[in-house]
Amino acid sequence: YSETRLPEVPSAILEMLSHQSFPDMRIAQDPLGKFYIARSIYKTILRFVNSNHGTRYVVQPLAPQNFSVTQNQGVALLSWTAQLDKTEPSARPTSYIIYKAEGQGGFDNGTIVNTTRCQMQLEPGKLYHFKVAAVNAGGESFTTETLSVLYNPAASKSVLIVNNFHRLASPQVVDDEEKQGFDFDQDPGVSYGLTAGWSGKQQVFDRSRMGN
């Protein structure tokens, strides 16, 4: 390809998966597979550019884990844990950004903290939303899920909401002697955030008609 033989900017052709290999397509449709591939490409580009300039690279951290919010007498306690990248020591977070939204408003520009715990004062009757991102010299991670809290001084009891749904999945896999593919009608899957990875549902599953 002339784009890589005669490039005006550094370029490369990445061939990681084959659209003719169903095991490869299962990886390509897996949200975690997409994330790992994208992050490995990002790391490679980062190392290439920094090595050309003779500078030390730092990989951006992964999103925090185990995020929780509790409140006591109008004070919200936010806590989380760091998610370490076992393949990249430089990706360790050095600080965190707490994003806050009040009522129907959008999120603010964030507050930087250096610990994995933080207290926030709450106004009675106002709904608050929080999310946290990890930060280091390499950049900012994806955020945690958004958690909400409301302080009602007149309440006699508290309500605890636990999100026990952390599933990520491709569309339903169909793979037997006669059929093969991804059935969106049976299960569209759960992507890692918004995705534009499809241009429509698979219509034909018959193995004998593949390639026609």
PLM segments and residue spans:
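Short beta-strand elements bearing conserved aromatic residues within extracellular beta-rich modules
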Residues: 94-98
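Aromatic-Pro/Gly-enriched surface loop or interdomain linker
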Residues: 145-212
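Active-site-adjacent mobile loop/cap segments within catalytic or ligand-binding domains
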Residues: 1-52
